[in-house]
């Protein structure tokens, strides 16, 4: 099985393998087989549209975790310029599961903060698989307060299974770190835009998710618990994860219908990992437009709007 394709994408993977095989044959023998390659590519695109037009909630959850999906640092490279990473919470240590720093978007200074999972084994371990400890959230809080002080908008990228539940994190008061971020973000006198780019897991996501504008990528998820965790509680087995995902309403379109999400950003055919540059350009365009819109509010109006937005949840 091709690791770049999930099991429900295998028919697409088979066609792509045939296309690559024909390209190799053409390169080796100087044969003109472009018509056959074009025919197979059209067939692959049609099949991809069919499969991705009927995804279940569980399939979307798995896409949100795809190992090739762009992470925060990938978007930082494509969307922003002059990124300068800042480290440490000034209390305990640095946390590589959250990256953040100053950058420029369309020439304007912004503060960018996001979860980072890591690709290779060593990096995954160093970044704790994108699960921040308290020092990660305290670092994020420090950067957000700095952004307010220097009148910079805050842009966050959410992609985490959840806050780290280990004993060391609990000893350093994980719940307090998350709660404090919620309190601070609700009162910051600067525009905040949050974008869920992969998994939006529980309080670990909310801790950098209180905002004036919430975006979700088309194949991202946002939930209070993972489908496997929910299934383990309700049915005593993770095998019911697909049923849990459907019942929980974790997808972008579902959350948009509930007015929890403000904007669903469409992904390239096959997901963001198929064309990171195109995905980045879509995000960049939306962020620029949204910052222009939020920039029209003075501080009092911005905070009032944020409060009303938060209080409208569940109504």
From Swiss-Prot:
Catalyzed chemical reaction(s): N(6)-carboxybiotinyl-L-lysyl-[protein] + acetyl-CoA = N(6)-biotinyl-L-lysyl-[protein] + malonyl-CoA
SUPFAM superfamilies referenced in this protein's UniProt entry, alphabetically: ClpP/crotonase
InterPro entries hit by this protein: Acetyl_CoA_COase_a_su, ClpP/crotonase-like_dom_sf, COA_CT_C
Record carries keyword Lipid metabolism: yes
Record domain CoA carboxyltransferase C-terminal: where: 32-293
GO biological process: fatty acid biosynthetic process; malonyl-CoA biosynthetic process
Subcellular location: Cytoplasm
Molecular-function GO term, any one: ATP binding
Source organism, top-level taxon: Bacteria
Pathway membership: Lipid metabolism; malonyl-CoA biosynthesis; malonyl-CoA from acetyl-CoA: step 1/1
Role played: Component of the acetyl coenzyme A carboxylase (ACC) complex. First, biotin carboxylase catalyzes the carboxylation of biotin on its carrier protein (BCCP) and then the CO(2) group is transferred by the carboxyltransferase to acetyl-CoA to form malonyl-CoA.
Quaternary assembly: Acetyl-CoA carboxylase is a heterohexamer composed of biotin carboxyl carrier protein (AccB), biotin carboxylase (AccC) and two subunits each of ACCase subunit alpha (AccA) and ACCase subunit beta (AccD).
HAMAP family: AcetylCoA_CT_alpha
Stated name of the protein: Acetyl-coenzyme A carboxylase carboxyl transferase subunit alpha
Gene, per the UniProt record: accA
């Amino acid at each position: 099985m091709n690791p770049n394709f999930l099991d429900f994408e295998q028919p697409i993977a088979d066609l792509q393998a045939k296309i690559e095989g024909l390209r190799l044959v053409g390169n080796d023998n100087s044969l003109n087989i472009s018509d056959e390659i074009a025919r197979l590519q059209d067939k692959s695109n049609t099949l991809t549209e069919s499969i991705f037009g009927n995804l279940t909630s569980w399939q979307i959850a798995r896409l949100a975790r795809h190992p090739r999906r762009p992470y925060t640092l990938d978007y930082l490279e494509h969307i922003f310029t002059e990124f300068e990473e800042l480290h440490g919470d000034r209390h305990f240590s640095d946390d590589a599961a959250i990256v953040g720093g100053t950058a420029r978007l369309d020439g304007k200074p912004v503060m960018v903060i996001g979860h980072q999972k890591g690709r290779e084994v060593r990096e995954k371990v160093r970044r704790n698989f994108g699960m921040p400890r308290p020092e990660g959230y305290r670092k994020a809080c420090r950067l957000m307060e700095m952004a307010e002080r220097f009148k910079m908008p805050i842009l966050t990228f959410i992609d985490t299974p959840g806050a780290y539940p280990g004993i060391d994190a609990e000893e350093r008061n994980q719940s307090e770190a998350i709660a404090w971020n919620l309190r601070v973000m609700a009162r910051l006198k600067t525009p905040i835009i949050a974008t869920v780019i992969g998994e939006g897991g529980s309080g670990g996501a909310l801790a950098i998710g209180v905002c004036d504008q919430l975006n979700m990528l088309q194949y991202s998820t946002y939930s209070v618990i993972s489908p496997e965790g929910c299934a383990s509680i309700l049915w005593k087995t993770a095998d019911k994860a697909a049923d849990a995902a459907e019942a929980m309403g974790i997808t972008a379109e579902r959350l948009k219908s509930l007015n929890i999400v403000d904007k669903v950003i469409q992904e390239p055919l096959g997901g963001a990992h198929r064309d990171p540059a195109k995905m980045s350009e879509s995000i960049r365009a939306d962020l620029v437009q949204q910052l222009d819109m939020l920039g029209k509010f003075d501080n009092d109006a911005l905070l009032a709007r944020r409060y009303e937005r938060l209080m409208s949840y569940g109504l």
